[in-house]
Amino acid sequence: YYSKNDSEKFPMNKIFNSFEEAVSDIPDNSTLMIDGFAGPGGTSQNLITALRNLGSKDLTVISNTAGLASVIGFGTLPGKTPVDIGILVENHQIKKVIASFPVSPSPSRPTAFEKAYAKHEVELELVPQGTLAERIRAGGAGIPAFFTPTGVGTTVSEGKEIREFQGKQYVLETALKADYALIRAYKSDKLGNLIYRGTSKNFNSVMVTAAATSIVEVDKIVNIGEIESSLIDTPLIYVDRIVEIKEN
């Protein structure tokens, strides 16, 4: 827990003035973890838009979906355009997606990813959702690999080591790490201690631990000491850059 007088002990300024500035050094061929569950709620929409405008190419994106907001629509405010990683696919910036739910629940409403995948413009690594979360967590914890029974005997286990433990078969899954994580949070203090809200609680807290650089957009930034320590979801050590959303 930090008091307001502790700012002198932490001189590094993590606060950026714009989303464009915060993502400006993301190069081609980067691997990114991008938050969100399905719709745009809890998703770092402003950082994704800034990355689209930056134009970095040949990106590998690790996310729960490959972009469903434009076809599902739930969670999008009236009059707002749905934003998720689908806009990066449309802009031909992604070469590979590692995800659990890459396609639309409705065949009549294909996503940008589905259209690109059908044209062989983007690669897909399909990962069961629980396995995806654990692979990301393992990356942040320094665990190189683990065995899980999920997916044994299916396409997701093809080419992977299978071992038997106590009479049951398990598949070896490797950890996931990223160069950058783009994250949405509700609140941050000036040091980067985060509080999540709603669907931003899902993958965000593990993604920030598994990325070399974590970039966070927040609804509000408060002074040091204004967030009670017991309420902190992600401690400052995992946060590198913070941008406050000026308009909601």
Model-derived features: positions:
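Conserved alpha/beta enzyme-core scaffold
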Residues: 10-248
